[in-house]
Amino acid sequence: MTTEQIVKAALKLIDESSLDDVSMRSLASELRVPVMTIYNYVASKEALNELVVDHALRQVEVPPPGEGSWEERMRQLQRGAREAMRQHPGLSFSRHGSSSREAMRLAEGAMSILHDGGFAPGEAEMAFATLFTFMLGQIELDVLSDSMGGGGEATFEGATGALDLNQDELFEVSLDAVIAGINLNLGTPANPRRGRTRGK
């Protein structure tokens, strides 16, 4: 028995239901071992939560300096994070994943990209918070669309009737809009802000 085996078994159960539905007892049953065997490797359910999120996010690469503008590097990072989370929709990243080791690695990578792009510390923090909020919303929308059998299509019912949107196209357009908004309202030395001053 290894921690890696436990994590992979947990992900299998999560993909069949959700992280909230997986207990240490159900995990032990899946592995056909006593519950205490699991606790010898993983101290708690909270620790298991972080381990499975780490496993899911490990594949996401932070584009190094020299691989394009800050905008393109951030697009690559956001695409990678989205793809990783879509593979395991039951993880509920917004509730369980933001403090995991790999999530922190990606957060530090995003901040590094923003600093390389010329943002001052305070502006970089604001830009990161904006991008992070966007990603959490996108993940939830992806999960909702997939759970409704959308197959990559998001359907909204409203006063104007049904509106069908391709999830990948929506993601790209929305990400471009967020990045453009960051440049407009925060700006960098190479691209001074043209929007309103923060707080006014």
Which residues does each PLM region occupy?
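Hydrophobic alpha-helical connector segments
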Residues: 61-105, 128-131
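Helix-turn-helix
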Residues: 5, 9-47, 51
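Short, basic, alpha-helical segments at the C-terminal edge of helix-turn-helix-like DNA-binding modules
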Residues: 54-59
